[in-house]
């Protein structure tokens, strides 16, 4: 089946209109296609610096050179490794100055916050914790839990099998999620690697239910669906339904 939910852009998520997860290359086209304004975004949690998750030209377009005046500050949160790699790329390929410099903060109305894993921090009204992703060694890739107003989600891409320290943190902080979003790069017949496959998603969902990490009415969604062994959306959605999870698609909206 061509088009519809089988036609996918690169992964990102928007929470409550003001919190973006990943400054990816497709966020502007997705915003226009789905009628989802990004005008109110004040915060961004960056998972890692791979090009399908971070397009630094979005930041350059905030400068006065592009006619932008009086833009509200965009606060970006990332690991030290991710922020330093982003700064190096931005200076070398785009702007000639470091993304971590006072000049960048002033010209781009932007601030980079370096975060550490397994230590809670506040992002505006959101309580957030970062977890080391099993992905892209040396790049400080992170997964995130986000809680506000008594509701919590876990955003788990990109990653292979979750580290045991992540499960331990879930227990120590008594985390219980209303929604879990997991990497599903590989399909049912493909082995996992630096990402999860379908059967590993099932294993993670089952363990989350067994350990009480997923709330009694919690839902598990697959995202980051690649071409490697994943069928068209209707077939994959049917497979997922049989195994206790759901398949996300571009433009999906979750409400409480």
For the regions a protein language model found, what residue spans apply to each?
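Active-site neighborhood of phospho(di)ester-bond hydrolases with catalytic His/Asp-centered motifs
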Residues: 20-24, 41-52, 77-79, 154-159, ...
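Cap/insert and terminal regions of metallo-dependent hydrolase folds
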Residues: 160-252
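Alpha-helix termini
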Residues: 35-36, 62-72, 93-103, 172-175, ...
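Active-site metal-binding motif and surrounding structural segment of the metallo-beta-lactamase
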Residues: 18, 24-77, 177-180
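Short, aromatic/basic amphipathic alpha-helical patches
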Residues: 88-102, 232-244
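Residue-level recognition of the N-termini of beta-strands and the immediately preceding loop/turn
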Residues: 41-42, 72-75, 105-110, 177-178, ...
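Core dinuclear metal-dependent hydrolase active-site scaffold
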Residues: 1-36, 111-168, 252-256
């Amino acid at each position: 089946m061509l088009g519809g939910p089988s036609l996918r852009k690169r992964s990102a998520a928007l929470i409550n209109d003001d919190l973006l997860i990943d400054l990816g290359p497709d966020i502007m086209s997705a915003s226009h296609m789905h009628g989802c304004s990004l005008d109110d975004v004040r915060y961004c949690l960056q998972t890692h610096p791979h090009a399908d998750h971070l397009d630094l030209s979005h930041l350059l377009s905030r400068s006065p050179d592009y006619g932008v005046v009086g833009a509200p500050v965009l606060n970006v949160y990332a690991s030290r490794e991710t922020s330093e790699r982003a700064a190096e790329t931005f200076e070398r390929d785009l702007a000639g100055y470091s993304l971590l410099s006072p000049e960048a903060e002033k010209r781009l109305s932007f601030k980079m916050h370096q975060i550490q894993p397994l230590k809670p921090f506040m992002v505006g009204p959101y309580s957030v914790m970062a977890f080391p992703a099993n992905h892209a060694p040396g790049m400080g890739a992170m997964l995130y839990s986000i809680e506000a107003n008594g509701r919590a989600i876990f955003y788990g891409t990109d990653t292979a099998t979750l580290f045991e320290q992540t499960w331990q943190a879930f227990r120590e902080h008594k985390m219980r999620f209303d929604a879990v979003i997991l990497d599903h790069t590989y399909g049912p017949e493909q082995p996992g690697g630096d990402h999860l496959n379908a059967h590993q998603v099932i294993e993670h969902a089952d363990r989350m239910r067994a350990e009480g990490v997923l709330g009694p009415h919690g839902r598990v969604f697959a995202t980051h669906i690649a071409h490697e062994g994943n069928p068209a959306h209707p077939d994959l959605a049917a497979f997922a339904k049989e195994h206790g999870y759901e398949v996300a698609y571009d433009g999906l909206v979750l409400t409480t």
